[in-house]
Amino acid sequence: MDNILKASNMEGTSTMTVTSRSSEDSSCISNHEQDTDTHKDGDTSGLENSKISKRKWMKEFFKLSKSPASKSSRSIGSMKSNQSLVSMKSSDDGNSYKNDYSSICGNSLPSAGLSRSNSVKELKLDSTGSQRSKNNVAMLARSSTTSQTTCSSSSSSSSYNSIKGNENDILLQNNNHFRHNKEIPQSKGSSNINTASIMSQYNVDTQATAIMSDMQKQYDSQQMTSPFVNEDLHFDPNGEVSHVIKAIFKEIGYKYDDFSDIPVFQLMQEMYQLVKKNSSARRTKITDYASKLKEKEAQLKSQNDKILKLETTNKAYKTKYKEVSLENKKIKEAFKELDNESYNHDEELLKKYKYTRETLDRVNREQQLIIDQNEFLKKSVNELQNEVNATNFKFSLFKEKYAKLADSITELNTSTKKREALGENLTFECNELKEICLKYKKNIENISNTNKNLQNSFKNERKKVLDLRNERNLLKKEILLIECHGSYSLLLVSNILTCYRFLLPSDTIIETESLIKELLNMNNSLSNHVSSSDEPPAEYSKRLELKCVEFEEKLLYFYQELVTKKIIDVIYKCFINYYKKSRQTDQKSNQNSSTPYKQSQRQVPHSIK
């Protein structure tokens, strides 16, 4: 009897977990089927994901069905904690499901504790959400009331950093729980939120408010004439900053036609109020989006944790089902023994009988859930059968293609034999061509060697030619220097003739002038003859030698006989005679001078003049 009481207590705890698990399994299955039905028409990737999830679920179910029954010595406290966690399941939209323990277990089982825990947690969530919203509203009120640009910029940067941090946390959690989130359909509201675009608009508004508040402060503090304001405190449309102000108006959304008639202070106030409204509205939107994102994060975390716990409870459910079936058999055997024996405790038997009836009803309900699961598995098996039929049809098509390919392979074999015969002929011809190519290669190598030798000889000859050219250029330069020296020496002789013409006879003067002209002409003809190299080298060398000999003879005659003997010697003699006469005249003048301080004037003879 003690064993029967222990079994009954174990049955009570196990059936509570089983019923809660079965109800949540059925709700999860129904929700999953609804989500898959809604996404079938819209997206083909949803079908593939649903099939993969079904197959995974089937594999896990068969593994659990094949696994051995767990021992009955498992702790009741862990089962109760799983039961309380299973009871707290919330949907994707934020609505929480009610506990079904009272409807399943009846009035005899205490389910008030579970419902209380659920309600308390919901109140905690609501209180935290309200506190966050209050804090966000307070921050927005502070940022809107203050007129300083530093406060607005700091609040915008802090809110932007908080939102970016939340987004990074969501991305990390999605990456960590990617395996579990594949089967859960995501909400459409979270995917449509473009936080980057909202924050860019918000930054533009904060910058505009900062600019306008700075301009207003400068205007109130200084009240000085500016390059874009008239004397009547109106904007100058032809000023320096008018196009900048128009661009700011367009960014803010302020409509203007002609702002030359509006005072500056009034226009600034209107723009400031408009920017205030836009920035406050956008800040409220940002805070709403941040709160929604945090709620979605909490929902995803709770759902992922619940899925893991549901998997563990499913395993426990199967093991407990086997234990309950064994205990049911024991109870039936005990009832048979009690019928045979004479037992007077009728009240206890009635209570136990009622308890066993309740357990049997629960077992029947569990069997119905298993039947529903079997129907779901049958549907999946039918789908798999359809896939098998489709693959068989594809296999038949592949067979037909294989037959066609076999025919084409036979044709290819015949064609390959023909090509092999042609290939043998081509190989024979190729061998002949290779021999010819070897001969040509040897000839080419010989030619290349001779070409290299010719190139080397050509380079040597070219170097010689370049050396000769350099020598020729040097000779030309020397000839030019000699010509220059000769021409200047002839000019010197002609200058001497002009200076001492009165001392020389006319025959020598005429002869020297004619020789100077001839020598100059010969010098020019030699230079021209050297520069022109169109004649053959033998004739060119002969003509040069003849001209050089003539030129040398005339030069010797000119300098040795004419210049030295007929000109320089005559001038030298005249100079000596003049010097002697001048000495004699000096002596006479010194003797005849009467005054000591009177200088003697030397008279130059008329012949020297």
From Swiss-Prot:
Q: What is this protein called?
A: Sporulation-specific protein 21
* UniProt family annotation: Belongs to the MPC70 family.
Residue spans of biased composition, Basic and acidic residues class: 32-43
Biological process according to GO: ascospore-type prospore membrane formation; cell division; meiotic cell cycle
Stretches of Low complexity bias are at 68-81, 143-159
Naming one, the record's GO cellular component terms include: meiotic spindle pole body
Q: What broad class describes the main subcellular location of this protein?
A: membrane
- GO MF term set: structural molecule activity
Chain's role: Involved in the pathway that organizes the shaping and sizing of the prospore membrane (PSM) during sporulation. May provide a meiosis-specific scaffold for the assembly of other proteins on spindle pole bodies (SPBs), and may be a limiting component for SPB formation.
| Coiled coil regions in record | 283-342, 357-393, 424-483
Q: Which UniProt keywords apply?
A: Cell cycle, Cell division, Coiled coil, Cytoplasm, Cytoskeleton, Meiosis, Membrane, Sporulation
Tell me, how does this one assemble?
Interacts directly with MPC54, NUD1 and SPC42. Interacts with ADY3. Interacts with ADY4. Probable component of a SPB complex composed of ADY3, SSP1, DON1, MPC54, SPO21/MPC70, NUD1 and CNM67.
Q: What residue spans carry the region label Disordered?
A: 1-50, 68-96, 124-165, 586-609
Originating organism? Saccharomyces cerevisiae (strain ATCC 204508 / S288c) (Baker's yeast)
Q: Which gene encodes it?
A: SPO21
Protein's cellular compartments:
Prospore membrane; Cytoplasm, Cytoskeleton, Spindle pole
Compositionally skewed regions (Polar residues) per UniProt: 10-31, 82-96, 127-136, 587-609
